[in-house]
């Protein structure tokens, strides 16, 4: 059976963009038989094997349920087509049947001699292999909760609970460059008069408090992707005045995009798919922790896990220089927005300000 694939059959995201190049390089323009799109790139799996080689490494980490140990939790198994959709974000979620047809066409030889891999629930055997985990797990405790508790109550600065070499490697896969002139925003509650551009930057050391990416006394410039994001993040009340500063980047920088730490493409050259797969739970935890809502009543200790991750990113050196200028993470308060935490506040300059009055706030609630 010939299955033709176009780039609209995939979520064009951080995971799947590496698939698009072979599709476009060895494709024809036509109408897709799956999604019915017109005049798109079509890839013939009968003629080319580029995608076959790309998927082979990923599929090799899975074992059909019939070959897994009896002790392997059945709840941790599911069909391969579901894994590709939900664990790896490779294909869109409209039709599992289409995904099945696509993957069996791409990997037709593997399907011929190992149909169980495609037709039975599958699992990753190493998830419960203590010897493998001891050598490849991001957390030596094998528990995010134990790691957080240790940071808060035992040893904050010289912990051995994290494989820092592995964390650095994961960070290298989510590098994000910004060019000189890039614009971000910062908001502060103010009076009707507003705050001058020269005072819109990071607070001085003696006024620096604990934040998501910095400990008390360590300066850090927090910016948002839009003025709206920064206003939401400020949590201003109804009838407050806020000053929004427009900040311009003064030189090229590279940051770690923690929004993508759990969306690393399995097709990146050099990535160990198995090692990444067994650590996805912890990477999801890092992503969740960066996006965790903090309440006024919460303890500053609740910032410690993200401060630890941020301080490590800040410490990464390459060729005698700091590798990363900051971290990027999703906005807690504004869906779809994101924030940038800069280790050096002087990398950006506030070039103009606007004063806004907050007219109304739309409160939403639920019973707890």
PLM feature spans:
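Short active-site loop/helix that positions an aromatic residue
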Residues: 227-238
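Active-site and NAD+-binding cores of ADP-ribose-processing enzymes
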Residues: 1-181, 186-214, 237-368
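A short, exposed loop/beta-hairpin motif centered on an aromatic-Gly-Thr core
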Residues: 217-223
């Amino acid at each position: 059976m010939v299955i033709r694939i176009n780039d609209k059959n995939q979520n064009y995201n951080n995971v799947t963009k590496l698939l698009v190049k072979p599709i476009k390089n060895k494709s024809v323009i036509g109408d897709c038989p799956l999604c019915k799109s017109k005049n798109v790139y079509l890839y013939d799996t009968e003629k080319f094997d580029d995608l076959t080689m790309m998927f082979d490494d990923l599929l090799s980490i899975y074992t059909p349920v019939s070959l897994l140990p009896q002790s392997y939790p059945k709840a941790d198994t599911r069909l391969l087509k579901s894994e590709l959709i939900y664990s790896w974000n490779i294909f869109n979620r409209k039709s599992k049947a289409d995904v099945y047809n696509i993957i069996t066409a791409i990997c037709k030889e593997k399907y011929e001699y190992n149909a169980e891999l495609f037709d039975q629930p599958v699992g990753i055997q190493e998830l419960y292999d203590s010897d493998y985990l001891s050598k490849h797990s991001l957390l030596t405790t094998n528990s995010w909760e134990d790691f957080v508790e240790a940071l808060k109550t035992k040893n904050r600065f010289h912990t051995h609970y994290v494989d820092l070499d592995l964390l650095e490697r994961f960070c290298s896969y989510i590098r994000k460059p910004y060019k000189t002139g890039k614009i971000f925003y910062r908001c502060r509650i103010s009076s009707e008069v507003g705050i001058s551009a020269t005072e819109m930057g990071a607070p001085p050391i003696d006024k620096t408090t604990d934040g998501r990416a910095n400990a008390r006394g360590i300066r850090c410039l927090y910016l948002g992707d839009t003025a709206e994001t920064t206003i939401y993040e400020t949590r201003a009340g109804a009838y407050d005045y806020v000053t929004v500063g427009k900040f311009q980047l003064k030189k090229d920088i590279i940051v770690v995009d923690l929004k993508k730490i759990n969306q690393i493409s399995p097709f990146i050259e050099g990535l160990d798919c198995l090692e990444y797969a067994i650590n996805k739970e912890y990477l999801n935890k890092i992503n969740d922790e960066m996006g965790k809502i903090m309440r006024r009543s919460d303890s500053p200790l609740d910032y410690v896990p993200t401060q630890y991750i941020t301080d490590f990113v800040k410490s990464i050196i390459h060729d005698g220089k700091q590798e990363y200028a900051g971290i990027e993470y999703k906005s807690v308060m504004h869906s779809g927005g994101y924030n940038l935490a800069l280790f050096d506040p002087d990398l950006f300059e506030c070039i103009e300000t606007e004063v806004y009055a907050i007219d109304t706030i739309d409160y939403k609630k639920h019973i707890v």
